[in-house]
UniProtKB/Swiss-Prot annotation:
The keyword Oxidoreductase does not apply. Homodimer. The epoxide hydrolase activity is mildly restrained by suicide inactivation, possibly involving binding of LTA4 to Tyr-380. This is Leukotriene A-4 hydrolase.
């Protein structure tokens, strides 16, 4: 299956191993890389290789130690520039060669965010982190930047000696750099084959604390205590995940808590999950982000979508496993409650994109579509809804878990397509083919909008949320006195999130209602980011001008796209806030992550910088 998001030709050759030497330079904001690729030919008379690059300067290419000619092709607006290497001799099928490439990144590499010391918690040292998913590894090193190709890697990273480097691999020691006493070299090895999007690097003033037999938490020292508290249950989650999905093959499961500009909730980099500090709620209520990233150790990292059009295979299964872990930790009613909340998230995404937008297909066509622009909760929640629906159809949670375990065993260390997944589903449930044949596969997979069927949910925990939400929707001015702090005193933070999510799917409330809500529930002071985000959106939609500064503060003080993009969009759509919103973005854009900055600029109809 051709990957529309890559120039590389995985049907002609595969990278089997990578040896990286990286030199991180904070002054020039560049990484100089010497990349050694072990390449295996998949055909006879292979005379050239095409690799993905983006904003890279290629200094030199050698094949088996001999200089090789190379040329950069035409640059594509978001795919980057193909690098064509002419081999000094043609390869036969199965033959391997070592391709060495010296390159330097651009300061505007889309995979890297360089933070100056003022943007860190410690305010003393600069900081660098990478985010390669989906198609940004090519802006660090030349590679086959497609999830269909997996390889092992070894790496040596040179950094200023007062800083520490970590990668998505096991640590393999450190040493002083011989040629420069001000620098240090950190070494890493990843012996499990991974796709390029799982290469990850962080460099900063990091400290670590062991919180379990295979988990160390890494962060700046200022965030270490709250992080250690928040993620104390990591080993318990790992054990539940192993019970559900099979043995954990990666050895170490460390967590890195990043500065606030990190664009995602978490990133499942092997051996070292990257986590947003916005989940530091102080009460462990948002730790399910960790259950999600742990689950990726099986669905995503071990069994990988072959192209980004099949992204739901990574995310739908991972959300399914995450909610099974939630069920083990907090009970089946909670799993069902989270599943229902996911359906509302899906409705939100469909409303944002539009119900006829082809990007709301479970399996979208990404030909000439930037994967970052296509990102939404659709692959997560439509994918989960399909699996949850199949669980109910095929005999319940335990029976469906048997399928999931077998699927992971069958496709471990490989990349997989939706067709292969479906074929395996049919072969596993061969005695239930008549049931499977009744599923509207076209409606689920290749049709935009909401799914053709809604699964059934246990409503025990949701009913109180629906009742309170509807009370606010139906309330007239004279009813507002009937609300009090008692309304929410028995609700968990998850239920309060759900009340606000229900209200966000309704018509905007009058300003009088949100003002009263603030009087009785004091939501402006809530620190939980998921509650705060929905509350501020509700107020902006109601047209309450007092919250404009609070919403702008949340949009700029952290950079998690799940929060930043909708807040900026809602503020832009609020006439009275528009000018201030655009000015705030223009003032802050140089401090933003490159992908976040590009997408928010698009949301605000501002041209790229």
């Amino acid at each position: 299956m051709a990957d529309p998001s890559s120039f590389a030709s995985p049907e002609k050759f595969n990278i089997k191993h990578m040896h990286l030497k990286l030199h991180v330079d904070f002054t020039s904001r560049a990484i100089a890389a010497s990349t050694s690729l072990t390449v295996r030919s998949l055909q006879d008379s292979l005379a050239s290789l095409i690799l993905d690059t983006k904003d890279l300067t290629i200094k030199k290419v050698a094949v088996n130690g001999k200089d090789a000619t190379f040329a950069l092709g035409t640059t594509h607006s978001f795919k980057g520039t193909p690098l064509e290497i002419t081999l000094p001799f043609s390869l036969t099928r199965g033959q391997e060669v070592i391709v060495e490439i010296d390159s330097v990144t651009s300061p505007k590499s889309s995979a890297l965010q360089w933070l100056n010391k003022e943007q860190t918690a410690g305010k003393i040292h600069p900081y660098l982190f990478s985010q390669c998913q989906a198609t940004h590894c090519r802006s660090i090193i030349p590679c086959q930047d497609t999830p269909s190709v997996k390889f092992t890697y070894y790496s040596q990273v040179s950094v200023p000696k007062e800083l520490m480097a970590l990668m998505s691999a096991l640590r393999d020691g450190e040493l002083s750099e011989q040629s420069d006493s001000n620098r240090k070299i950190y070494r890493f090895k990843q012996n499990v084959p991974i796709p390029s999007y799982l290469i990850a690097l962080v460099v900063g003033a990091l400290e670590g604390r062991k919180v379990g037999p295979r988990t160390t938490i890494w962060t700046e020292k200022e965030l270490l205590e709250p992080s250690v508290y928040e993620f104390a249950e990591t080993e318990k989650m790992l054990k539940y995940a192993e019970d559900l999905a099979g043995p954990y093959v990666w050895g170490q499961y460390d967590l890195l808590i990043l500065p606030p500009s990190f664009p995602y909730g978490g990133m499942e980099n092997p051996c070292l999950t990257f986590v947003t500090p916005t989940v530091l709620a102080g009460d462990r209520s948002l730790a399910s982000v960790i259950a999600h990233e742990i689950s990726h150790s099986w669905t995503g990292n071990l069994v990988t979508n072959e192209t980004w059009e099949n992204f739901w295979l990574n995310e739908g299964h991972t959300v399914y496993l995450e909610r099974r872990i939630d069920g083990r930790l907090y009970g089946e009613e909670f799993r069902q409650f989270k599943a229902l909340g996911g359906w509302k998230e899906l409705q939100n995404s469909v409303n944002t994109f539009g119900a006829t937008n082809p990007l709301t297909n479970l399996v979208p066509n990404l030909h000439e579509v930037d994967v970052d622009a296509a990102f939404s909760s659709v692959p997560y929640e439509k994918g989960f809804a399909l699996l949850f629906y199949l669980e109910q159809l095929l005999g319940g949670p335990e029976i469906f878990l048997g399928f999931l375990k077998s699927y992971i065993q069958m496709f471990a260390f490989k990349s997989v397509t939706t067709e292969e997944w479906k074929k395996f589903l049919y072969s596993y449930f061969k005695d239930k083919v008549d049931i499977l044949d009744k599923v509207d596969w076209k409606g689920w997979m290749h049709t935009p909008g909401m799914p053709p069927v809604q699964p059934k949910y246990d409503m025990t925990l949701a009913n109180a949320c629906i009742t309170l939400g509807q009370k606010w929707v139906k309330a007239t001015e004279s009813d507002l006195g009937s609300f009090s702090a008692d309304d929410v005193k028995d609700l968990s933070s998850h239920q309060l999130i759900e009340v606000l999510a229900i209200l966000l799917l309704e018509k905007p409330l009058p300003v009088s209602h949100v003002k009263r809500m603030q009087e009785v529930y004091n939501l402006n002071d809530v620190k939980n980011s998921e509650i705060r985000f929905r509350w501020l959106r509700l107020c902006i939609r109601a047209g309450w001008e007092d919250v404009i500064p609070l919403a702008l503060a949340m949009a700029t003080e952290q950079g998690r796209m799940k929060f930043t993009r909708p807040l900026y969009r809602d503020l832009y759509n609020f006439e009275k806030a528009r000018e201030q919103t655009v000015n705030t973005f223009l003032k802050n854009r140089s401090f933003m992550h490159p992908v976040t900055e590009m997408l928010v600029a698009k949301d605000l109809h501002i041209s790229a910088s």
